[in-house]
């Protein structure tokens, strides 16, 4: 019987608050390890994406970073962006890394968790349906 491969998670911290957020999310994932849950971590270098990648490699999403993400089952992505790069042509700005990842992974949107509380919970529910 073949052993099943562990799910692979690529960690791309980026810059700004990204490294802090990804580090804490990783701590949570590591704390959850046990029977029934484990993973293989794929660590990208600190300058693998965003402004740091543009500074080091001349582009916000180097091919090696995209290849790492494509080899993973999931990507934990921090953040990118640096106002010092606002003068660059659009294709070299750090934020282009997000679009490159979406395109390279066949995705169309970023998922962001939100919580709706209080009066907003029912704010978008119609009080009557059209035609009734």
Model-assigned labels for residue ranges:
Residues 2-19, 23, 34-38, 46-132:
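Anion-binding alpha/beta catalytic cores of soluble intermediary-metabolism enzymes, centered on
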Residues 42:
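The conserved SAM/SAH-binding core of class I Rossmann-like methyltransferase domains
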Residues 26-29:
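Short, solvent-exposed amphipathic alpha-helical segments in soluble enzyme
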